[in-house]
């Protein structure tokens, strides 16, 4: 497999873009080599500048649940764009999107559109503080909630990949009101409530911790969080940027049967376009300006092109509930197949799958970081060279889409088995 054009593009990019990329993990620093520059995508396949074809399990990091270039989404975007790209004013499309989300997710009575998951989380936290008149937020080690200053503490995703648990430029003041608990450990949360009595505004959690690999919640963990937040009169925020409209049409709340007070969304709700949203109970959301005193705004929020792509995606999912059955079945086939091939730990929830390069059980940040990242790098490059594109990080999920087929799963497992069949995977 040649990457000559991608190499040239990467060298050009490094002269004008920090690290040559617009998101750190894309630089392949954790796995080595040159990142392929992608030219086009269709269904479950992506194609790079050199003409190489890959079965894609990144899916733009989650949004492409229907597969790339889905006809319904492309048609919706094409019809909308001829009327204009952005107005900076209210449109019917943003009303339709909000109505659709509130219909599909009963716990969300009102919703506000933004442009990214980071914006959604940043805004939801501000709303939680404004509503409760409290300052402190509990998050979990290894969970990633975007790159707002107050959330860049013990994070997952790219920062975890690069060995940066915090970030330069984040002041002690910005992070002082963020408290860290241990994922899947309700006692660690109770202790923080005891130590900060009456001053915790909210607990924010990824219902499935999908930015330190894929770490499912233990039995009753989410239920216990719900009970504890009710008892302490704090809000429970579900970060469903990844799980929203993926695990089920109602997201993780429907999948696990636990409702949050506020929910953040991104990825799938944009159908591939830059979109985020946050929503929740009416009484909480009415704290947001111009109704309330919690200020949040955005020039491109509710962009009509993004709304049309998102509406088309959500309607396709709603009108075809068999999609969830199919992607969850494929996810199970993939995870069970991986589990038979390798001695290492495989975790999955629905269409989210991860192989941890450790033989220990993985339930939290501390156990996830025991993974052999060097081995993962060799595994990644073996798959890449054999036409299988997964995230260039041990601590990210494989995303199965409705465009994947059983044949794709079989081919993927065959390529994986070739790697692990070697007594000593190459250095």
UniProtKB/Swiss-Prot annotation:
Keywords associated with the record: Cytoplasm, Isomerase, Porphyrin biosynthesis, Pyridoxal phosphate
The protein, known as: Glutamate-1-semialdehyde 2,1-aminomutase
Compartment annotation: Cytoplasm
Reaction catalysed by this enzyme: (S)-4-amino-5-oxopentanoate = 5-aminolevulinate
Keyword rRNA-binding in annotation: no
Family of the protein in this entry: Belongs to the class-III pyridoxal-phosphate-dependent aminotransferase family. HemL subfamily.
Cofactor(s) the record lists: pyridoxal 5'-phosphate
Biological processes annotated in GO: protoporphyrinogen IX biosynthetic process
Highest rank taxon of the organism: Bacteria
Organism: Acetivibrio thermocellus (strain ATCC 27405 / DSM 1237 / JCM 9322 / NBRC 103400 / NCIMB 10682 / NRRL B-4536 / VPI 7372) (Clostridium thermocellum)
Associated pathway: Porphyrin-containing compound metabolism; protoporphyrin-IX biosynthesis; 5-aminolevulinate from L-glutamyl-tRNA(Glu): step 2/2
Molecular function as annotated in GO: glutamate-1-semialdehyde 2,1-aminomutase activity; pyridoxal phosphate binding; transaminase activity
InterPro entries named among the record's database cross-references: 4pyrrol_synth_GluAld_NH2Trfase (IPR004639), Aminotrans_3 (IPR005814), Aminotrans_3_PPA_site (IPR049704), PyrdxlP-dep_Trfase (IPR015424), PyrdxlP-dep_Trfase_major (IPR015421), PyrdxlP-dep_Trfase_small (IPR015422)
Known EC number: 5.4.3.8
Main location: cytoplasm
């Amino acid at each position: 497999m040649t990457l000559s054009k991608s190499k040239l593009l990467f060298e050009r990019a490094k002269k004008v873009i920090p690290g040559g990329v617009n998101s750190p993990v894309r630089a392949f620093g954790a796995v080595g080599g040159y990142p392929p520059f992608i030219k086009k995508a269709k269904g479950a396949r992506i194609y790079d500048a050199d003409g190489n074809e890959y079965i894609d399990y990144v899916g733009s990091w989650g949004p492409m649940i229907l597969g790339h270039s889905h006809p319904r989404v492309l048609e919706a975007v094409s019809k909308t764009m001829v009327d204009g790209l952005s107005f900076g004013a209210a449109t019917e499309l943003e009303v339709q999107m909000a109505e659709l989300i509130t219909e599909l997710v009963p716990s969300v009575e009102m919703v506000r559109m933004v442009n990214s998951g980071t914006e959604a989380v940043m805004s939801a936290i501000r709303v939680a503080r404004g509503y409760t008149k409290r300052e402190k937020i509990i998050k979990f080690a290894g969970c990633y909630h975007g790159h707002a200053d107050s959330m860049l503490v013990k994070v997952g995703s790219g920062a975890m990949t690069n060995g940066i648990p915090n970030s330069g430029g984040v002041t002690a003041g910005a992070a002082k009101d963020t408290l860290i608990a241990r994922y899947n450990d309700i006692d660690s949360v109770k202790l923080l409530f005891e130590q900060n009595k009456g001053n915790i505004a909210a607990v924010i959690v990824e219902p499935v911790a999908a930015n330190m690999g894929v770490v499912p919640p233990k039995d009753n963990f989410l239920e216990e969080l719900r009970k504890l937040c009710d008892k302490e009169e704090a809000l429970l925020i579900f970060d469903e940027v990844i799980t929203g409209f993926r695990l089920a049409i109602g997201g993780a709340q429907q999948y696990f049967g636990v409702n949050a007070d506020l929910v953040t969304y991104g990825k799938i709700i944009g159908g591939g376009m830059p979109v985020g949203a946050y929503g929740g109970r009416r009484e909480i959301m009415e704290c947001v300006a111009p109704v309330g005193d919690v200020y949040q705004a955005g020039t491109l929020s509710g962009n009509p092109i993004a709304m049309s792509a998102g509406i088309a995606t959500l309607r396709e999912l709603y009108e075809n509930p068999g999609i969830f059955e199919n992607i969850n079945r494929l996810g199970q086939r993939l995870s069970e197949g991986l589990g038979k091939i390798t001695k290492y730990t495989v975790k999955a929830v629905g269409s989210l799958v991860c192989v941890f390069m450790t033989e220990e059980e993985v339930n939290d940040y501390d156990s996830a970081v025991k993974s052999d990242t060097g081995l993962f790098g060799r595994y990644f490059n073996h798959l890449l060279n054999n036409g299988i594109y997964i995230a260039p990080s041990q601590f990210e999920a494989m995303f199965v889409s409705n465009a994947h087929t059983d044949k794709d799963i079989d081919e993927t497992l065959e390529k994986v088995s070739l790697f692990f069949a070697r007594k000593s995977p190459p250095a």
